[in-house]
Amino acid sequence: MVVADVVTEFIEGLVETYPGLQYLDGFPEVKVVIRADASGATYDKVAVISGGGSGHEPAHAGFVGEGMLTASICGDVFASPSVDSILAGIRAVTGPMGCLLIVMNYTGDRLNFGLAAEQARSEGYKIETVIVGDDCALPPLLGIAGRRGLAGTIFVNKIAGAAAAAGLSLADVAAEAKRASQMVGTMGVALSVCTLPGQVTSDRLGPGKMELGLGIHGEPGAAVADLQPVDVVVSHILKQILSSVCSYCGASLSFLTPCRLPLPSRKT
């Protein structure tokens, strides 16, 4: 396996599997996946674009489709996509209704998407941006750059995509996405750290240990603890997300299980 080809091969496989998707001219240097039925010149709805570093599949290219993303901008593994790639994606799918950029709260993503948005506006495109920072592992004051963007971005993508599909204006789609981003909170639990293709897996987490709030790129979490029964882990996570420190509240909850964790369960 050639490490540099990992992202390219993922995109090729995705597009070959789903005929409703395509990639832009310039691939693989420009790693942009778009809906095959979305053409900027004629697209009559708000375009919803997200993206970021690869290595978190199915995010974000796997979320391109009707009622969700119009396009996904893919960087290399754990690397923000370039300004040129983001701008190419905007130009490809943005019509008269404008474009909403959904950006996870990481410095590189915010910088590159922000620069691309400024350039697109200077070319006459209508652009709005929503930043998603849903990580509840660390109190706000302990996060220098603010909360990290995590799996809660999926909800923001879906709500924005549904609003765009319904024909709402750019301002209304952005407002719905912003409200969703303010209402979502996420905390993860990991039994091992992430592994980059072609590199040795870290042994920082030993057997029988788990890390609460480990970052999706291997950033330190809130604490390392002994492995606990799943009900204890879930209870701790919910208390953190719903605490006054994190400022999330609501009468209903939704749960995402992005991967199976072999946590021990209690015998009843």
For each predicted feature, which ranges?
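N-terminal amphipathic/basic leader segments beginning at the initiator methionine
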Residues: 1-48
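Gly-rich Lys/Arg/Thr-decorated short loops/hinges at beta-loop-alpha junctions or inter-strand turns
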Residues: 43-51, 60-73, 137-140, 210-226, ...
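Short glycine-rich or small-residue beta-strand-to-loop segments that form or flank ligand, phosphate
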Residues: 46-53, 69-72, 98-107, 114-117, ...
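Glycine-rich oxoanion-binding loops at beta->alpha junctions
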Residues: 56, 60-96, 235, 239-244
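Short glycine/serine/threonine-rich phosphate/pyrophosphate-binding segments
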Residues: 57-60, 83-87, 108-114, 137-140, ...
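Short Gly/Thr/Asp-enriched flexible loops that form oxyanion-binding sites at enzyme active sites
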Residues: 110-125, 143
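Short alpha-helices
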Residues: 132-183
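Mixed-charge interfacial surface used for oligomerization/domain docking
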Residues: 164-268
